[in-house]
From Swiss-Prot:
Protein name (record): 3-dehydroquinate synthase
A GO MF term: 3-dehydroquinate synthase activity
Record's GO cellular component terms: cytoplasm
E.C. numbers: 4.2.3.4
Keywords: Amino-acid biosynthesis, Aromatic amino acid biosynthesis, Cobalt, Cytoplasm, Lyase, Metal-binding, NAD, Nucleotide-binding, Zinc
Positions of NAD(+) binding: G102, V103, V104, G105, D106, T126, T127, K138, K147
A UniProt-annotated Pfam family: DHQ_synthase
Superkingdom classification of source: Bacteria
Family per record: Belongs to the sugar phosphate cyclases superfamily. Dehydroquinate synthase family.
Pathway annotation from the record: Metabolic intermediate biosynthesis; chorismate biosynthesis; chorismate from D-erythrose 4-phosphate and phosphoenolpyruvate: step 2/7
Amino acid sequence: MFVDIHTSSKQYKAEVGSGILREAGKTIEALAPASSYLIVSDENVANRYLDVLVSSFSKEPHTFVVKAGEQSKSFHVYEQLAAFCLEKQLDRQSVIIAFGGGVVGDLAGFVAGTYMRGVRFIQVPTTLLAHDSSVGGKVAVNLPAAKNMIGVFHQPEAVLFDTELLATLPEHEWRSGFAEIVKLGFIADASFLAWLRETVPALTSIKADNLQKMVAKAIAIKADIVGKDEKEHGIRAHLNFGHTLAHAIEAELGYGKITHGEAVAIGMRFAFRLSLRFTKEDLRLADYEEWFSALGYDLRLPAGLSAQRLLARMKSDKKTNAGKIVMVLLAQLGAAYTKTVDEHLLLELLEEELGGRS
């Protein structure tokens, strides 16, 4: 399956299919001829699949492997990778290939966007979550106190998504990626949301053809939003539904202590509750709480967190305007909007959530 992605800066395709990794090198060489190729991966992916990707090239590419986990989205690792590019004499005709999950995609993409003021790169995601981060051109590294704060917009030349690679993912990584897929239904496509509820009663029961349809549709929805607002001046902010609180949770717990998507699921439930303060629409929150619980999500705020500290973290969100927290809310299922929300209301709801843990 192919999805066309059109932005103001670039047009490219995302290919979603089973077994495409085995021919990925030839595909990349035909699509983006280069003076040299560099594959960036993490230890987990490299141990399983790096040889398959390397052997698919006609000429052996350079490889750079980082530790798995959010700690690799740092300035220290960024500098190491940029120095490696210089050592291996990558030039402006080179192509960097991000082969991994969202961390690798962000790191490799940020280096590609800044090395020599920008070289081409290709996304080869290996997690369900990375269906989201691999499309749209947002690439960044973290600051110790805030996620994705230092970055650029740098669109890839292509996205190659081999769904066979998802077979080895642990269940918590399925939950992480699936939350971002459901998010797209919540904010932009109620019919897709209904199809997901009907098709996925359990994450272990997704058929191969439905998995490809699900990923391709999610990419298409995001591509449509990004095509209308590449640099996030308007509706692209809707993709941050659930993320204002999610990023605060991740920072408070320490990056890597909870998966991004599981934090987003908690953040979406909070945003649902907040949305109900401003709409008379029936958002069917209880139905979605029941479905997510059946899928194995814990939608409660993690124990031991402080409402005041979470609120302070939320003020570091990129949507914040003049110190005011801007939240993505639902007008109805399939339709989102942004709203500046009084911090006293946010604090009240956070304290309710933390006080309601049992």
